[in-house]
């Protein structure tokens, strides 16, 4: 797949982009793991479930607390992905290969990798069981199992992805199909969806819409394209400041938005999508498409739904300030699998990791946690091939911006940060346990003021 060349207008911006790319290339891949998969030891001081962003980051931090030989991570996959870049992969601006490294290369040196899937959690006995039947006990448990994609809850999927006009940026199996569908677009409806469930990176479903609109303009197809965003929500974005900015972009670019529309069926042979109208029970809306981008329904992993650590919706039930489980004091959660009332993003995981590290440090010393997570999360809203609105906010859905300028404005610099600096931070700082979010930068840029 040949990526579309990013449009950067000024010489200063182009120089900045080259600098960031050079830094990323020089850094090279992480080479943190020197051991092999665990085959013998069955008890660990700290056991981490999940090898995604939260799991790897916390395994690294816990290695420093208790020693590598006392930490293990349970993760079945041989590949680790930096998923935020898939928005740009689906729009042809980045290669998929840039988003992947081997799991072996990102697990910290000396930490034991149990390459298996979690089958059962038994927090009352301080142990878990894997698919292979292995029982592993722990003193402290960190749950970082992520979120589950439920494509099968939409009639006609996932088998519908075999057809050429459907894609989804949420799966490694389908993200490149988005780019192919975009390239193959001739005329008609370009349809983008948002489901009636919690999702990871709630801005991503509309990011690909803005990028597609920009691609159509760039290739001369815009006059023949009717761009439609069907969302199950009642608003374009959950933070008013950024919602107002997005509404202006939607108006300027002539995008149609239908609220309370939830995708329930895809008819790929007819190129039709069927939506239920949430505020009109029993009513459906069938829309033909020339291109369809699907954001799937999502939920907590099945293994959590049937476990004692879950709340009524299946998410890990943690204190929203300390990330400690509400019932089991030696169990902790981080990231998408938790019921933290904030947007599920990699930026949120970074901020949570610093809080959780400090929380566990104090608990290990029989002290009360004092560091409190404020719900910080971030969503770089890509609005074009060289424009981003950098949304940052907290539990109260109020802006919590890092930079000393209005981040609701589209900026080239924020696009460069999204496309080049953030991947660098992820691979070289966050996964190594050195990046806990931009709170210290916020204080610096705002001269210590809130």
From Swiss-Prot:
Cell membrane as UniProt keyword: no
Coiled-coil blocks: none
Cofactor: FAD
Recorded GO MF terms: glutathione-dependent sulfide quinone oxidoreductase activity; quinone binding; sulfide:quinone oxidoreductase activity
Cofactor annotation comment: Binds 1 FAD per subunit.
Active-site annotation: 201, 379
Binding positions for FAD per the UniProt entry: 53-54, 75, 83, 118, 336, 344-347
Enzyme class: oxidoreductase
UniProt modified residues of type N6-acetyllysine: 134, 173
Gene Ontology BP term (one): sulfide oxidation, using sulfide:quinone oxidoreductase
Modified residues (Phosphoserine): 343
One cellular-component annotation, GO: mitochondrial inner membrane
Compartment(s) where it occurs, according to its Swiss-Prot or TrEMBL record: Mitochondrion
E.C. number: 1.8.5.8
One of the Pfam families matching this protein, by short name: Pyr_redox_2
Disulfide bonds: 201-379
Primary residence: mitochondrion
Assigned protein family: Belongs to the SQRD family.
Function: Catalyzes the oxidation of hydrogen sulfide with the help of a quinone, such as ubiquinone-10, giving rise to thiosulfate and ultimately to sulfane (molecular sulfur) atoms. Requires an additional electron acceptor; can use sulfite, sulfide or cyanide (in vitro). It is believed the in vivo electron acceptor is glutathione.
Protein name listed in UniProt: Sulfide:quinone oxidoreductase, mitochondrial
């Amino acid at each position: 797949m040949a990526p579309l060349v990013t449009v950067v207008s000024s010489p200063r911006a182009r120089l900045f982009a080259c600098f960031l790319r050079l830094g990323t290339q020089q850094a090279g891949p992480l080479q943190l793991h020197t051991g092999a998969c665990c085959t013998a030891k069955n008890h660990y001081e700290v056991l981490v479930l999940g090898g995604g962003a939260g799991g790897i980051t916390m395994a690294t931090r816990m290695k420093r607390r208790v020693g590598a030989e006392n930490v293990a991570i349970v993760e079945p996959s041989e590949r680790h992905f930096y998923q935020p870049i898939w928005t740009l992969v689906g729009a042809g601006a980045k290669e998929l290969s840039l988003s992947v490294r081997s799991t072996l290369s990102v697990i910290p040196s000396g930490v034991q990798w149990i390459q298996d899937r979690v089958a059962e959690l038994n927090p009352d006995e301080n142990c878990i069981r894997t698919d292979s039947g292995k029982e592993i006990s722990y003193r402290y448990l960190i749950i970082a199992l992520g979120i589950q994609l439920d494509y099968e809850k939409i009639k006609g999927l996932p088998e519908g992805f075999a057809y050429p006009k459907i894609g989804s940026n949420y799966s490694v199996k389908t993200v490149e199909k988005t780019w192919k569908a975009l390239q193959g677009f001739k005329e008609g409806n370009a349809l983008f969806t948002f489901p009636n469930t919690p999702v990871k990176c709630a801005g991503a479903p509309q990011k690909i819409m803005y990028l597609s609109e920009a691609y159509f303009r760039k290739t001369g197809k815009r006059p023949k394209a009717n761009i439609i965003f069907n969302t199950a929500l009642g608003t374009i974005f959950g933070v008013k400041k950024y919602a107002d900015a997005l509404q202006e972009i939607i108006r300027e670019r002539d995008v149609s938005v239908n609220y309370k529309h939830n995708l329930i069926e895809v008819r790929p042979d007819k190129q039709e999508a069927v939506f239920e109208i949430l505020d009109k029970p029993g009513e459906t809306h069938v829309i033909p498409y020339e291109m369809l981008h699907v954001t799937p329904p999502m939920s907590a992993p099945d293994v959590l739904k049937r476990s004692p650590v879950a709340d009524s919706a299946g998410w890990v039930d943690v204190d929203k300030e300390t990330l400690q489980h509400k019932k089991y004091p030696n169990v902790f959660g981080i990231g998408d699998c938790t019921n933290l009332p904030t947007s599920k993003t990699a930026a949120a995981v970074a901020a949570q990791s610093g809080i959780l590290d400090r929380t566990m440090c104090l608990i290990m010393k029989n002290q009360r946690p004092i560091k409190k997570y404020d719900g910080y999360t971030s969503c770089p809203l890509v609005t074009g091939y060289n424009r981003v609105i950098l949304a940052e906010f907290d539990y109260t859905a109020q802006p919590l911006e890092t930079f000393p300028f209005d981040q609701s404005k589209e900026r080239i610099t924020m696009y460069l940060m999204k496309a080049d600096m953030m991947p660098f931070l992820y691979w070289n700082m966050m996964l190594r346990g050195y990046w806990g979010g931009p709170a210290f930068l916020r204080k610096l840029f705002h001269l210590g003021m809130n």
